[in-house]
């Protein structure tokens, strides 16, 4: 059976870019990508298997600077290649102008990841248009979006919040990554480059954690139908990833993943769906896999669906990584415990 996945990423760095990824192949085909300078480079440097990037942007200069091989100009007649000017209405009009072009890219696709740097013009305005087109085609759509830093201003944050609200009504599952949390968790002395790099890493973890379950072999395999069950029509979602080493690595990685310090403050207890990727070398023990399962099952509702798969990576000898996506989350927390996971150790960072 041919399974086709499409990933569309809209990320803010210096410019706003929509990165559209498309690949077709037998079995479980995969498309993964990132947009905007460091995000694209980070995705490319990760050497994700079976990945093809296509950047689509309203800014023609940004497309020329793009490191990916395929590009798509959006709204050329409207913007003349000069970008959306931080105006979501222009971004929306640009995407609407090229609805047929976007729809053609979506054709035959089973799943997309839509990742947007919300608050700017192209991402905030174009992402809902793409999501709507995907919904019309019955494509499973998972959005992973960033919320601006506070220093980016109230107007940009307000635009982001409106865009997040609109996008949430169109996608199957929505994960929000507030950039401001990076400053809280990593400290105020972090450089701007490091802050955006960390955000790009979270974006990579989200896409990689889900896609690898479908595309890479493991002792316990997960197929596209499993992913659809957990993520279809679920609403608010949360993603966390952590890597640990040592005798308690499975417990530390699982706890670190569910704490998810860089993601939106949500209470995942009672989640309707849990999708878990346990990645490790061939030294992973059955008891470790069971420990991860016990911890993540604490957060699922009684009638929730839990899907756990493994990915074996020979280069991860001695390491164990847990990536978890919790879907169907109902309540936000007001003062969650934030935990920073580093080198296999779990430390309280912010309360």
Functional labels for PLM-detected ranges:
Residues 1-11:
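Feature marks short, highly hydrophobic, charge-poor N-terminal signal-anchor/signal peptide-like helices
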Residues 18, 23-34:
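Short terminal targeting/anchoring segments
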Residues 12-17:
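Hydrophobic core segments of alpha-helical transmembrane domains in multi-pass membrane transport
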Residues 32-351:
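Tubulin/FtsZ superfamily GTPase core signature
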Residues 7-8, 20, 207:
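Hydrophobic alpha-helical segments with strong N-terminal bias
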């Amino acid at each position: 059976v041919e399974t086709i996945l499409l990933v569309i990423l809209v990320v803010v760095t210096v410019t706003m870019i929509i990165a559209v990824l498309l690949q077709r192949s037998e079995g479980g085909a995969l498309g993964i990508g990132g947009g905007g300078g460091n995000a694209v480079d980070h995705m490319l440097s990760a050497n994700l298997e079976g990945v093809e990037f296509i950047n689509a942007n309203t800014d023609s200069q940004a497309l020329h600077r793009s490191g990916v091989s395929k590009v798509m100009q959006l709204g050329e007649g409207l913007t003349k290649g000069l970008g959306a000017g931080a105006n979501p209405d222009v971004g929306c009009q640009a995407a609407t102008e090229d609805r047929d072009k976007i729809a053609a890219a979506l054709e035959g696709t089973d799943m997309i990841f839509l990742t947007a740097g919300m608050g700017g013009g192209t991402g905030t305005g174009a992402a809902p248009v793409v999501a709507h087109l995907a919904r019309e085609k019955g494509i499973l759509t998972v959005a992973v979006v960033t919320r601006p830093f506070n220093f980016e201003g109230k107007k940009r944050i307000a635009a982001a919040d409106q865009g997040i609200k609109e996008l949430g009504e169109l996608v199957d599952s929505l994960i929000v990554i507030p950039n401001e949390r990076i400053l809280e968790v990593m400290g105020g002395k972090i450089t701007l480059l490091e802050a955006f790099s960390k955000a790009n890493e979270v974006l990579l973890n989200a896409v990689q954690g889900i896609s690898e379950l479908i595309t890479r072999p493991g002792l316990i395999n997960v197929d596209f139908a499993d992913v659809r069950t957990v993520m279809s029509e679920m609403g608010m979602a949360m993603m966390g990833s952590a890597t640990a080493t040592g005798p308690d690595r499975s417990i530390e990685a699982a706890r670190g993943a569910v704490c998810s310090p860089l993601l939106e403050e949500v209470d995942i207890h009672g989640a309707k769906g849990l999708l878990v990727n346990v990645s490790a070398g061939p030294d992973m023990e059955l008891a470790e896999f069971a420990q991860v399962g016990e911890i993540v099952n604490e957060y699922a509702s009684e009638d929730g669906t839990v899907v756990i798969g493994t990915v074996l990576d020979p280069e991860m000898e001695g390491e164990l990584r847990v990536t978890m996506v919790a879907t169907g989350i109902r309540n936000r927390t007001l003062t969650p415990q934030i935990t920073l996971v580093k080198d296999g150790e779990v430390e309280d960072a912010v309360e």
